[in-house]
Amino acid sequence: MAVTRRRFLQGSAAAGAVVAGRRLLFGDFDVFRGASGRGATPLPLIEDFVPTTCWIGKQDCGMIARRIDGRVVKFEGHPGNPRNLGTLCPKGQAQISAIYDPNRVKTPLIRTNAKGVTGEFRSATWDEALALVADRVNEVRARNPKLVLWQKGRSKAKVFYDDAFTKALGCSKLGHGAYCSDTGYRAMEYTIGMHGVQHPDFDHVNYLISWGWNITNAGGNKFCWLTWNQQLVKARARGLKVVHIDPRLRGAGPFTDLWLPIKPGTDLALALALCQQLIEKGYLDVPYLSTYTDGPHLVGEDGRFLRDADGLPQVFDRAANNAVSADAAADPALEGSFLLGGNLYLTAFEVFKRHLADYTPEWAAEVTGLRAADIARVAEEFGENAQIGSTTVIDGVELPYRPVGIMSYHMAQQELGFQAMRAMTMVAMLVGAVGAAGGLRSDFTWKVNKNYEAFGNLEVKDPPYDFTLAKSKYYPINTGHPGIVAKVMADPAKYGVEEIPEVAILHHVNPLGGFTDQQAMMAGYERFRFVAVIGPWISETADYYADVVLPAATIEKYEGPLSASDGIVEATALRVPPMEPLFESRGEIDIYLDLVERIGVLYGEGGYLDQVNISLGMKESEFALPLDAKPTVREIFDQWANFKKIPGGVAFFEGNGVFVKGKIPPSKIYGYAADPPFGGARHRLYGESLLLAQEAMKTKGAEQIYWQDYTPLPTWRDPTYEGSPPDYDLYLISYKLVEHKQSRTTNIPLLVELAPRSRLDINPATATARGIGEGDEVWVESHNAITGETRRVKTWAALTEGMRPDTV
């Protein structure tokens, strides 16, 4: 669908309105003045429309930019983009303010005062600023490239930033996901091999557990907001039943059949009880559990798998009446105990079943604050709705049909999150819903992530460690946590680290304003010898620690490639600049092209252009970028689009915005339809490698707080916050607002007007007991049971019945 069109606006009313708007946004430019200066003569104004994508939100919704004389005056949703189908959230509409924000960084800046205090900067040319950054980077690269750190907040063109840039430099990199959803990602990679958290198959699901999903006001796994809500509404229209598990009702009320107001941080206990009930009531998909999980693997009294001479796990084959390798078994036993060679072995499923024996609904009710009857009811309904043994045909492919699903995402970020997510996944595994039609999904396509294999062979090394503490006795499963890195930077010897980064390149990230424990962040960032910041504004981090600030464009740039898939159809989008970059800002890819050229790693084998070719999959094709000539960003995307056989190359996106390939085939969506099924991964009920890692951590002297949750089966323990003094008698949770995205929206006036400040949601009974009324200012103080520290913040009270009385 072509959406670009041009026309002339004639007539004084239309022209006058546009002139007024133009003056408001852009000032009183000479183009509006009469040649003699004796009165304004409205000129014909050119209106056109440019397809692009949202710059602020997570999921890159399609947008149509309305322009007057080349300047954007309005954004609307792109009706042809599968992700948002013509709709936009408040962020999409309001980001026009970000483009014209007078507080944007207008030129490159160089600090003129000491760091650690409010910054003073002078304007610089791009040549001077880039030369300074390149010199500092090369000074350190000459000794050790890993001592250059590239850190991102939100990366919108992973190929060019996360991959090509860091590989060309050989530098370290650090993301923000440890504050977002990485716990869920790591748990799913470990358990079923998928790089995602949890979402349902909305086209076919009949029963959904909405587990901490902020229905109607936030995103979920993979998507930001609009896509899931539209799919939810369609599913509800055909009868989808929803169970909402959350201490706060949120906006889920009209879309929920049962609300379980769980005590914060006790999701693991509930998931264990659901597993216990499913097994007790016989809701088991035995063929799936026997064939595609490690449930039949034999476990010795030491907790380790029985293995043959080649190291392969053994199962008890009832056909052979003996132990054989898992892949060779004709009839593997899922349950039972077996005496082999004088030693007793239980199947992993048998170990799991016995492990769950005491995790009853009555036990979970005491822990979670829910009713035992409701817990048993959800387990019963989940098992019934799974329709174990049934099949359906989708696009000509017969698949197991298990129309029960789970949606979860940010709730994974809790103290027991890794094991909670594993247990929640096991709820779906028991009924065979993982990768089935209507069942549990985790990514858009069924592709086993490299971490699945790596996590099955966890390394726990002796120091010295690198500054992320990867493969250390502290964090064998490591996602690169900025908060931990900051603590290591401040005191590397404490963690057995000998070298810390000296130069940081911060890409759209604001650790001081966006991450927790500001004091620790400041202590860490003080250790960098040089900091370069790429972004449109002076953030708190740039203010205190940037040596150089490079002004990035907002939406006015080429960026991508971007997925436009809704999980049902396959589509690709590209961010197309709806106007030229304002001031002296540049698109990030332009910045990196210039920077790597200055550093000396743009050309040749292994250089930036070579890495771009590799990351885009073009290296061996006729469309590969030449390694001896500097392209424009548009030329790069034109080569890529032609490589992808998109008609017209990049011009297609400039005219259409999105390329819709078609419906995703079942072989990509469903694990059962993949070749081989589930990508060859054997799903882990029993985590032997977690046990081995725990033993190694203990041997190397790690404290209990580090190793206590490396258990082969999800195991409940009281969260550490229960050790706070009794005066701290409420639980504190956070939630997302659709009006804001991280800290990049806090300076957009339209969004600040819609959601001007945080509030404290509190149950009326709790508020009354404390003498708190609607709108009262209150202090909220929290206590760290590990360090004994307290932090407090002032906010205002909002009374709501949709909140547990012991939770705010």
Where are these regions (language model features)?
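Glycine-rich phosphate/diphosphate-binding loops that line cofactor/substrate pockets in enzymes
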Residues: A129-V148, Q198-L208, H355, V378-G405, ...
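Phosphate/diphosphate-binding loops
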Residues: F528-F530, W537, V576-V596
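Flexible glycine/proline-rich, aromatic-decorated loop/lid segments
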Residues: G251, E540-L574
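Extended redox/cofactor-interaction regions of prokaryotic respiratory oxidoreductases
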Residues: D162-L240, H244, A269, D331, ...
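Gly/Ser/Thr-rich loops at beta-strand to alpha-helix junctions
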Residues: K152-F160, I215-T216, M411-Q414, N510-G513, ...
